[in-house]
């Protein structure tokens, strides 16, 4: 059974503060993901579950409106029926589950879909060598991005949620998704693709999806540059096959005035912390990358992301990000892309 993109997950860590002056870093936290797709345009958020039983679970969205002001909205789910939000968001910062523990997958998704339509024949569950797939309507593959959420709305297999993890490599208008389908979609399945965040039930309950470098800010013009640090983990959740000769790659730099670099912890399952998010890790890491993307750092010896029971506590590779904000840098709706590469059978 090969390691596929479905198996490779970026998790958060124990201490991911949103203010300065408190400890940052620590051990991997499997209930936190750092992967989502931002709003394509400012707008409201819809809240939904894949299970009709989710009538007491809540989702809290924190984000910025079009003026850059922080806003928070909490909604109680009504099962598979969409709950429409009222607050407009331009950028999402975090989505946090609360209330009764969710029975199904739950999501906060943009009310305005990126695309919608009827699927083509060709969706599939993982074969062990390829990930689960979804076949979009003709021509839509060029309009979607990794991280966006597919919500099936009718036809075969309605009320399913999955996150896009790859948009190339599997055929025209075919995207890879992060989990198997309960019912594989077919040519009758209707759907939307949306920005937002998916909090999966399996292989473990995700309760938080958040943006790295949440709520950082530059010094005033004429002041000093500020450097912030954030820790995440790359994990291989394949239960049978290690990812060998593994590397972590900064694939796409953030736009705007900031500069992102990264370093790897020299041991798996690292628990190191820093005094606050403006303090650099002093030991137990490789050198930080330098320069524009793409930048690659090989996983330190033995060089593998091991297999193990998902979520895989046997081999989480720590990643420290550094983000330099020059004084006077204006707020910017931007993102960056990290990837994991390696060899598999």
Where are these regions (language model features)?
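Short, intrinsically disordered N-terminal pre-domain segments
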Residues: 1-29, 181, 344-345
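Beta-sheet-dominated interaction scaffolds and their linkers
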Residues: 18-32, 204-237, 248-249
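Short, solvent-exposed loop/turn segments enriched in Ser/Thr/Gly
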Residues: 26-27, 224-231, 315-319, 330-337
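C-terminal interaction-tip segments
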Residues: 63, 110-116, 329-345
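Small/polar beta-strand repeat architecture
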Residues: 71-146, 151-212, 221
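Short, acidic/polar linear motifs in exposed loop/turn regions
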Residues: 181, 236-240, 327-329, 344
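Surface-exposed interaction patch
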Residues: 222-287
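Intrinsically disordered, low-complexity Pro/Gly/Ser/Thr-rich segments with frequent PxxP/GP/PP motifs
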Residues: 267-275, 292-329
């Amino acid at each position: 059974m090969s390691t596929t993109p479905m198996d490779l997950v970026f998790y958060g860590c124990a201490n991911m503060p949103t203010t300065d002056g408190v400890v940052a870093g620590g051990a991997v936290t499997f209930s936190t993901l750092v992967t989502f797709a931002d709003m394509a345009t400012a707008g409201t958020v819809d809240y939904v579950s894949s299970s009709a039983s989710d009538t007491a679970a809540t989702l809290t969205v924190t984000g910025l409106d079009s003026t850059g002001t922080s806003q928070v909205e909490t909604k109680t789910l009504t099962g598979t029926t969409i709950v429409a939000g009222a607050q407009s968001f331009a950028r999402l910062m975090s989505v946090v589950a609360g209330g009764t523990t969710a029975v199904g997958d739950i999501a906060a998704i943009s009310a305005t879909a990126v695309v919608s339509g009827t699927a083509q024949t060709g969706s599939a569950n993982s074969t062990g060598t390829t990930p689960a797939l979804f076949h979009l309507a003709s021509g839509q593959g060029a309009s979607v991005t990794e991280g966006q959420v597919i919500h099936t709305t009718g036809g075969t297999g309605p009320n399913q949620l999955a996150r896009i993890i790859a948009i190339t490599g599997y055929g025209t208008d075919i995207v890879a998704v992060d989990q198997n389908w309960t019912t594989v979609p077919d040519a009758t399945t209707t759907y939307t693709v949306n920005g937002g965040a998916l909090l999966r039930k399996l292989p473990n309950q995700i309760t938080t999806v958040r943006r790295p470098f949440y709520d950082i800010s530059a010094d005033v013009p004429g002041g000093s540059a500020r450097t912030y640090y954030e820790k995440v983990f790359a994990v291989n959740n394949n239960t049978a096959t290690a990812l060998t000769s593994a590397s972590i790659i900064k694939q796409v730099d953030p736009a705007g005035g900031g500069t992102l670099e990264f370093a790897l912890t020299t041991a798996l399952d690292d628990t190191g912390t820093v005094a606050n998010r403006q303090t650099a890790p002093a030991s137990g890491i490789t050198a930080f990358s330098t320069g524009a993307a793409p930048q690659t750092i090989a996983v330190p010896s033995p060089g593998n992301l091991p297999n193990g029971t998902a979520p895989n506590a046997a081999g989480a590779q720590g990643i420290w990000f550094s983000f330099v904000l020059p004084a006077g840098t204006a707020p910017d709706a931007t993102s960056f892309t990290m990837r994991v590469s390696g060899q598999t059978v």
